[in-house]
Amino acid sequence: MERIYLDHAATSPMDERVLEQMIPHFSGSFGNPSSIHSFGRESRKWVDEARAQIAAEIGAAEQEIIFTSGGTEADNLAIMGTALARKDLGRHIITTKIEHHAVLHTCEKLEGDGFDITYLDVDQNGRVSAKQVKEALRDDTILVTVMYGNNEVGTVQPIEEIGELLKEHKAYFHTDAVQAFGLLPIDVKNSHIDLLSVSGHKLNGPKGTGFLYASKDVKLSPLLFGGEQERKRRAGTENVPGIVGLKEAIKLSSEERDEKNEKYQSFKAIFADTLRDAGVAFEVNGDKEHSLPHVLNLYFPGVSVEALLVNLDMAGVAVSSGSACTAGSVLPSHVLTAMFGEESDRLTSSIRISFGLGNTAEQVKTAAKHVADVVKRLT
């Protein structure tokens, strides 16, 4: 039985070309990048090269890239680091109700520490507006954090509009771009973004890698203490193989962005058309106009999502009910709850399909046929 992986928004397989670049550095470039001898200088060269390439990709300066262990750490450093560094200027933070839990739980922690958090509502497409942000801004607002593209329903937020609004305000603008990076072109200067989080394993790079872009004008308090790595902002010996892999994954995603976007959009159409041809009733969750190309969230009226997922897994098709970080949770999706309310049937009858490396049109059609068969059997 062929297994079909359509859960790339949870994690993506590593591109073999990325692995090829990493392998020599597991044993070859083993020197500590902070050491002044030749072994250390060799490792430092690879780290600096990666930093320069990644910075250029988003229109940043090299010193504005902080390597992290992934998106969660990058989000924590952006939010906690800002809160600790700017608490004397204010204790108000604005975010949305559909953020990744790396953002939401960090904000909840700060609430317990005396910070005031405003959680913006979203419309039924999962979108906020710059107007909402403007209305929520206060003199003591020190940070606005709005994700670039949602990991569950794929809705893309009006980042440039929000950035334009905030450029004259003292509040820093952070965006969790983990799901969007590599598929949407991002220029931090043109979008007036102060802080941006990225994870390697969502773009066919290695797990345990990522970075935080922090504008040179941003002041952050470090969360890790020890050495003076990353310009004293993130202590710990650099993961040279991982950083090399992250650099290569970002390079490939940039070179192949247009091709992937076109392919994934066609996959969405194939999936939906196959369901329609089979006579299956469904609706799309999320904004159809402002959407990530690889994420498709579907609502099947009257179908138990648990039964659907189990049956699909038995058929060799891997999809999900939402964020992998809430797998096994008895609570419904906080994203769908924010969009449709606590009583909506969509909370218990929706699945997320997400496309990526290795998927073919034939696989997508086969998976959609399996979904149609299971839905018919369950209704």
Curated annotation (Swiss-Prot):
Binding site for [2Fe-2S] cluster: C325
Keyword tRNA processing: no
EC number: 2.8.1.7
Location of the active site: C325 (cysteine persulfide intermediate)
Annotated keywords: Iron, Iron-sulfur, Metal-binding, Pyridoxal phosphate, Transferase
Annotated positions of the N6-(pyridoxal phosphate)lysine modification: K202
Binding site for pyridoxal 5'-phosphate: G71, T72, N151, Q179, S199, G200, H201, T237
Principal EC category: transferase
Cofactor(s) listed in the protein's UniProt record: pyridoxal 5'-phosphate
Transferase among keywords: yes
Catalytic activity of the protein: (sulfur carrier)-H + L-cysteine = (sulfur carrier)-SH + L-alanine
Matching InterPro entries: Aminotrans_V_dom, Aminotrans_V_PyrdxlP_BS, Cysteine_dSase, PyrdxlP-dep_Trfase, PyrdxlP-dep_Trfase_major, PyrdxlP-dep_Trfase_small
GO MF annotations in UniProt: cysteine desulfurase activity; iron-sulfur cluster binding; metal ion binding
Primary role: Catalyzes the removal of elemental sulfur from cysteine to produce alanine.
PANTHER family with a match to the protein in the record: CYSTEINE DESULFURASE, CYSTEINE DESULFURYLASE FAMILY MEMBER
Family: Belongs to the class-V pyridoxal-phosphate-dependent aminotransferase family. NifS/IscS subfamily.
Name of the featured protein: Putative cysteine desulfurase IscS 1
